């Protein structure tokens, strides 16, 4: 799987385009539709997944409306064409936060739940310290060598972040 990161909008949100064969999944199209569409090119968009509904993660979503069907993901395993992943509900930053885990590839897309050397804010509407602690405990059970792609900033490993968020749980 090829992973392209596109930094979009005033809040420097990471949007990801995952490509297998000529198909792709777009994660968090926060803004700058043209930049995202340029990266998508002539690939077939099979899904657009939002890690949580804050404006900086959904700003370009309406531009894709003709290409998608609204669907609320629940915890569990999903297979869309050749893409296989798990959705893990990880509230804390916001009640609707999800983490997208590709087990075979050992990668996670965490939105604003986990960042490199930090975790998401809990003082915004929908944030919860107790939910964040539960979500961090849940994610801490996953393998250390998983690469974490967050909603802002640089990539990291789950091992590095476990060392950081152990202070919160």
Residue ranges and their predicted role:
Residues 1-40, 99-111:
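Conserved beta-strand hairpin/beta-sheet module of binuclear metal-dependent hydrolase folds
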Residues 8-10, 19, 27-41, 65, ...:
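Mid-domain alpha/beta scaffold segments of enzyme catalytic cores
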């Amino acid at each position: 799987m090829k992973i392209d990161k596109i930094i979009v909008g005033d809040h420097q949100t990471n949007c990801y385009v995952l490509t297998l064969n000529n198909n792709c999944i777009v994660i968090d199209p926060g803004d700058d539709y043209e930049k995202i569409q340029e990266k998508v090119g002539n690939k077939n968009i099979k899904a657009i997944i939002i890690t949580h509904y804050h404006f900086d993660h959904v700003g370009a979503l309406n531009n894709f409306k003709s290409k998608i069907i609204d669907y609320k993901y629940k915890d569990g395993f999903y297979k869309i064409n050749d893409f296989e992943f798990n959705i893990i509900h990880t509230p804390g930053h916001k009640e609707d936060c999800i983490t997208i885990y590709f087990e075979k590839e050992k990668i996670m897309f965490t939105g604003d739940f986990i960042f490199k050397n930090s975790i998401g804010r809990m003082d915004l509407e929908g944030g919860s310290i107790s939910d964040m602690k539960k979500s961090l405990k849940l994610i801490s059970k996953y393998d250390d060598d998983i690469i974490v792609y967050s909603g802002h900033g640089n990539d990291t490993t789950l091992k590095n972040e476990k060392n950081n968020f152990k202070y919160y749980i």
